[in-house]
């Protein structure tokens, strides 16, 4: 993302002020929920709850990989469809991108019965046509993380290789693309009619929209940003990995929706981005993200029954190690994700 001019204010405080809403006292919600929850939303910077839904439970889930970023809120639509929500960076955004407990996050959602995840993330734009406040539905990923983040549930003594040629779920991507009208649904359209939601089909001539995932927490140098553009990068963030890889291993359909806040540092013709600009874009993105999420939850409830089914059982046959050679403690650990796959 681009360079910031602070103008004497604290960025994190302004961001929190910009996304503040009157909230239900979640602490008073029940700490248990009976029944499966098939859809989850993971919120990124600027999206810390789903205000259009009705919270019914707040869960603290311990996994074989520790605790997730925070409590998971179960909410229902007006029709009664349940959705799990988890704030990736914690309720107070106190987790660095490299410190997000992604394995615990995905494992906890899997434990709830989640079959599909719609994840939101703020991004910097690497292309002129992807403007601040635009939304992007990426189809490919380039990994520029540094190996700091655990990116697999498997480990020495229990080896598996998940397919990742299509890092986002094609059926979930299509459901999202088909659900959002090309015009008029979200605020922020240009006068020339360019859609706010950039998809492979409607804005990129059928070419992939590629997200670069960098380690952070520092932003890119200008040279790095130009390199990513030369690779065909569309947007850049610090969050899509290992989240997408772990979702694939957990046999959960996954799609990220990116919310552009600014141009990355490649664009010298742009004025340095001020805090006020970023906060304004975050606020607009947050409102649009909530509207988009509400629409997609209804679409998933109506049409998403088959999404994720083609992934079920895939990891059972992705294991290279003979189960007879795996230590019992490793099998017990993986039983959290895959009960019944391997005899303990």
Curated annotation (Swiss-Prot):
CDD domains: MTAP_SsMTAPII_like_MTIP (cd09010). One of its GO terms (molecular function) is S-methyl-5-thioadenosine phosphorylase activity. Pathway: Amino-acid biosynthesis; L-methionine biosynthesis via salvage pathway; S-methyl-5-thio-alpha-D-ribose 1-phosphate from S-methyl-5'-thioadenosine (phosphorylase route): step 1/1. One of its GO terms (cellular component) is nucleus. GO terms for biological process: L-methionine salvage from methylthioadenosine; purine ribonucleoside salvage. Keywords: Cytoplasm, Glycosyltransferase, Nucleus, Purine salvage, Transferase. It comes from the Eukaryota. It catalyses: S-methyl-5'-thioadenosine + phosphate = 5-(methylsulfanyl)-alpha-D-ribose 1-phosphate + adenine. InterPro entries: MTAP, Nucleoside_phosphorylase_d, Nucleoside_phosphorylase_sf, Purine_phosphorylase-2_CS. Its EC number is 2.4.2.28. It is found in: Cytoplasm; Nucleus. PANTHER family: S-METHYL-5'-THIOADENOSINE PHOSPHORYLASE. Homotrimer. Catalyzes the reversible phosphorylation of S-methyl-5'-thioadenosine (MTA) to adenine and 5-methylthioribose-1-phosphate. Involved in the breakdown of MTA, a major by-product of polyamine biosynthesis. Responsible for the first step in the methionine salvage pathway after MTA has been generated from S-adenosylmethionine. Has broad substrate specificity with 6-aminopurine nucleosides as preferred substrates. NCBIfam families: MTAP. Belongs to the PNP/MTAP phosphorylase family. MTAP subfamily. This is S-methyl-5'-thioadenosine phosphorylase.
């Amino acid at each position: 993302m681009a360079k910031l001019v602070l103008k004497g204010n604290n960025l994190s405080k302004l961001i929190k002020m910009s996304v503040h809403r009157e909230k239900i006292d979640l602490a008073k919600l029940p700490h248990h929920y009976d029944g499966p929850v098939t859809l989850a939303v993971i919120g990124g910077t600027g999206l810390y709850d789903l205000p259009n839904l009705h919270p019914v439970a707040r869960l603290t889930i311990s996994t074989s990989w520790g605790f997730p970023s925070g409590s998971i809120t179960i909410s229902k639509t007006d029709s009664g469809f349940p959705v799990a929500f988890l704030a990736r960076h914690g309720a107070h955004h106190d987790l660095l991108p490299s410190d997000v407990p992604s394995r615990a996050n995905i494992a906890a959602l899997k434990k709830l019965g989640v079959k599909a995840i719609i994840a939101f993330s703020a991004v910097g734009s690497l292309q002129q046509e992807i403007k601040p406040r635009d939304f992007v539905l990426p189809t490919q990923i380039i990994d520029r993380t540094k190996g700091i983040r655990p990116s697999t549930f498997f480990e020495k003594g229990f080896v598996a290789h998940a397919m990742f040629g299509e890092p986002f779920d094609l059926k979930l991507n299509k459901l999202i693309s088909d659900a959002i009208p090309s015009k008029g649904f979200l605020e922020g359209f240009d006068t020339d009619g360019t859609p706010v939601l950039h998809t492979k089909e409607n804005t990129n001539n059928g070419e992939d929209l590629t997200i670069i995932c960098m380690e952070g927490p520092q932003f890119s140098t200008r040279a790095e940003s130009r390199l990513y553009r030369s690779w065909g990068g569309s947007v850049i963030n610090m969050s899509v990995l290992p989240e997408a890889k772990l979702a694939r291993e957990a046999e959960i359909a996954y799609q990220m929706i990116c919310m552009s806040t600014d141009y990355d540092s490649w664009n010298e013709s742009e004025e340095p981005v001020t805090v006020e600009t970023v906060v304004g874009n975050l606020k607009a993105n947050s409102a649009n993200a909530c509207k988009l999420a509400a629409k997609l939850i209804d679409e998933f409830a109506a049409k998403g029954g088959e999404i994720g089914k083609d992934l079920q059982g895939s990891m059972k046959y992705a294991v290279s190690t003979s189960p007879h050679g795996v230590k019992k403690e490793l099998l017990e650990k993986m039983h959290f994700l895959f009960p019944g796959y391997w005899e303990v």
